[in-house]
């Protein structure tokens, strides 16, 4: 399925990378992979598919252009995006992770053949669409490697892996353990999966600089991510809940300054700013993530009182933000809180 085909006139095989979920993470990783590839004279091309609430086929011109800026050519279906891909990243909302993984498995298991009879060409796309120089991490004839970046449950990860095993693909459970826009290709990644899949991830040399191999089965990295979320999302939720009440009581500055002081001066100020504003932007996705956290904790025999509360709080914030424009990145936490009404 992964074809690792050579561009005509070039000794370097083309690595085709697909992003199912063509959002901010995909664009940052595509830019990083391309930069790493360019430094070594290798060839890569990118495809993407997105089915978000706002950005889905038929894509708006500005969304196509946004992805094109990092070399991603958008496809209209999952099957077109992953056809012939050597590496597939899955990065969607937590509650769509399992269904997306199964769709990828179905597409890879079936294969898509274009009019010329070549598996992996997106209809209407040339061999160089979205290409930048990158190398032969694409092993001719090798099974495609699917890298699941989703903050979903270990159970969902195992279900997806089983489907991909049946489809003949290799699978890596890769959990993002910090903020991608801040750390970019240096973001901490925990990975788990079968040894041959982990070896393929390492051999691909995509340019990630902070990878921790847990040397464990798929589902372990996602468990680490979920349990980290128990702390981080509950912390975000408690900050926003407290600050909203403080704003209504007319003492937002008093409460915020006290919290920041406890977190320790400038680091605390930056942390609190990021947590509060980040929640406004990603409440819906994080509510779905915390639904998975509640399920995981209960499966482990731990009562999920705090996580359930954080889930419900995030869902409420998502509803409040539904018809509101998020504040600008440079806005203060107070402005973000007031924007909720």
Model-derived features: where do they sit?
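Rossmann-fold NAD(P) dinucleotide-binding segment
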Residues: 78-170
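Nucleotide donor/acceptor-binding cores
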Residues: 13-15, 144, 187
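NAD(P)+-binding Rossmann beta1-loop-alpha1 motif at the extreme N-terminus of oxidoreductases
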Residues: 2-84
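Short, basic/aromatic-enriched C-terminal tail that caps enzymatic domains
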Residues: 327-341
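Helical "substrate-binding/catalytic lid" subdomain
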Residues: 224-329
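A generic structural signal for well-ordered alpha-helical segments
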Residues: 67, 164, 203-205, 246, ...
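Conserved beta-strand segments of alpha/beta enzyme cores
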Residues: 45, 73, 145, 170, ...
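Rossmann-fold dinucleotide-binding core
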Residues: 20, 114, 123, 152-232
């Amino acid at each position: 399925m992964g074809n690792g085909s050579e561009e005509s006139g070039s000794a370097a095989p083309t690595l085709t990378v697909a992003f199912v979920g063509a959002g901010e993470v995909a664009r940052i990783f595509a830019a990083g992979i391309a930069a790493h590839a360019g430094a070594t004279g290798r060839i890569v091309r990118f495809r993407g598919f997105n089915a978000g609430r706002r950005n889905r086929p038929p894509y708006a011109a500005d969304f196509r252009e946004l992805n094109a800026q990092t070399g991603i050519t958008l496809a209209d279906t999952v099957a077109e995006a992953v056809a012939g891909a050597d590496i597939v990243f899955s990065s969607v909302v937590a509650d769509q992770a399992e269904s997306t993984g199964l769709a990828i498995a179905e597409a890879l298991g079936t294969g898509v053949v274009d009019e010329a009879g070549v598996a992996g060409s997106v209809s209407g796309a040339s061999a160089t669409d979205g290409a930048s120089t990158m190398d032969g991490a694409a092993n001719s004839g090798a099974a495609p490697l699917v890298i699941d970046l989703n903050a979903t449950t270990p159970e969902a990860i195992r279900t997806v892996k089983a489907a991909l095993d049946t489809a003949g693909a290799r699978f890596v459970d890769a959990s993002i353990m910090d903020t991608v826009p801040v750390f970019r290709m240096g973001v901490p990644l925990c990975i788990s999966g079968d040894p041959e899949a982990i070896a393929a991830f390492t051999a691909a040399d995509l340019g990630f600089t902070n990878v921790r191999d847990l040397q464990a089965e798929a589902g372990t990295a996602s468990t680490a991510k979920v349990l980290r979320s128990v702390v981080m999302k509950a912390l975000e939720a408690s900050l926003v809940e407290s600050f909203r009440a403080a704003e209504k009581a007319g003492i937002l500055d008093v409460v915020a300054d006290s919290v920041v002081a406890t977190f320790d001066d400038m680091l605390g100020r930056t942390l609190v700013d990021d947590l509060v504003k980040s929640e406004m932007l990603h409440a819906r996705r994080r509510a779905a993530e915390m639904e998975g956290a509640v399920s995981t904790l209960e499966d482990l025999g731990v009562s999920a009182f705090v996580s359930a509360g954080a889930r419900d709080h995030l869902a409420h914030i998502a509803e409040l933000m539904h018809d509101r424009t998020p504040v600008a990145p440079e806005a203060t936490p107070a402005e973000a809180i007031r924007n909720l009404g």
